[in-house]
Amino acid sequence: MIKEEFDPRQVMTERYYEFHHSYNETPPTVEFHQHPFYEIFFFISGNLNYIIEGRSYKLRPGDILLTSNADIHRPEVRPGRPYERIVIWLADDFFDHLKRFSGEDFTACFTDAALKDYRLIRPDDGTLIRLRQLCEQMSDAKFSKKLGSAALTQAYLIEFLV
C-alpha cells in the first residue's frame, strides 16, 4: 500500500471522496477541527488517543472511528512509535449518489454513532483482515492508470462501507 506524506489540510479537493494512507515517524500536531464531510479513521499503529465531541478514545491497532460532518475532533499523538493510519473522507454528494443508486442511506452508521455518543468500532479478526485487504485494493486502484481504476476504487469503498 502506498503511504502518503501527511497533509494538514482539512478541506477536500475531490468531489466525492478521498482516501489517504499516511505514516509519520514524528507525530504531527493537529488542532481541534470540524469539516463538512464525513470521516472514517482506520488506525494502524502508533500511540494515540482520539477526541471526538469531548469524548476520548484510546485506540488499538485495527480500531475504526466514525466522524460525522459536524463533529469537532482531533488526534492526540504521543511520540515513541510510528503513527500510521488510513483516513477516508466522504462528501454528502457521495452519499447522495449512493442513495440514488441503492435506495439506502449510508450515513446511517455515522448518525447512529453520533446519537449513541460512541464512534469507535473494534472489528473482529476476520473483519479486520477483510477491511485491510479492501484498503490495499483501494490504494492500488487509486494510484493505477488503468481504465476503470476510479470506478474500482469506488466499488472497494462501497464494499468497505457495507
Model feature map: region roles:
Residues 1-64, 71, 79, 103-119:
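Generic protein-terminus/edge-of-domain signal
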Residues 51, 97-98:
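Residues that scaffold the ATP/ADP-binding catalytic core of kinase and kinase-like folds
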Residues 70-94, 101-102:
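Ligand-binding loop in jelly-roll beta-barrel domains
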Residues 105-159:
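Amphipathic alpha-helical segments enriched in hydrophobic/aromatic residues interleaved with Lys/Arg
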